[in-house]
């Protein structure tokens, strides 16, 4: 499946570039009502930006992923940075039982950038805000 192909790519890049510290897996979420109508999730501080969500994999499904809490700490640090200027940009962090290939580094994040109901412009604006917050978090050593 898609995650097996993604895993092969991650392994290849980590082997070729062993200094890689962070792996970002970017998605658009599918949030819809019972009739299949897609929800459009927007940041309250910037109506032109979609909301974001971190999905953190764990070892809850039985597969080895002992350091998953390191990824959770990173997600929380980035979310805290973003919260200062954009309190409604981030949806709550979700921890799931699957690994989502996050066992490959302790700097792995799955980022849901808006939903299928958001426009491309809203997703790009949110991604720019995320990138600035991610960089600021790293610069501050959090």
Label every model-predicted segment.
Residues 67-94:
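Active-site-adjacent substrate-binding region
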Residues 31-64:
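A short, glycine/acidic-enriched catalytic loop
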């Amino acid at each position: 499946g898609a995650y097996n192909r993604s895993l092969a790519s991650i392994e290849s890049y980590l082997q070729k570039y062993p200094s890689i510290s962070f792996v970002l897996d970017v998605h658009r979420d599918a949030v819809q009502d019972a009739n299949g109508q897609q929800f459009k999730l927007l940041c309250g501080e910037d109506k032109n930006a979609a909301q974001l969500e971190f999905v953190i994999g764990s070892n809850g499904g039985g597969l080895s992923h002992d350091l998953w809490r390191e990824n959770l700490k990173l997600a929380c640090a980035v979310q805290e940075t973003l919260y200062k200027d954009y309190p409604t940009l981030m949806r709550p962090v979700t921890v799931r039982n699957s690994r989502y290939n996050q066992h490959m580094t302790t700097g792995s994040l799955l980022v849901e950038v808006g939903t299928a109901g958001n426009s491309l412009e809203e997703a790009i604006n949110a991604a720019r805000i995320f990138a600035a917050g991610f960089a600021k978090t790293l610069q501050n050593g959090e």
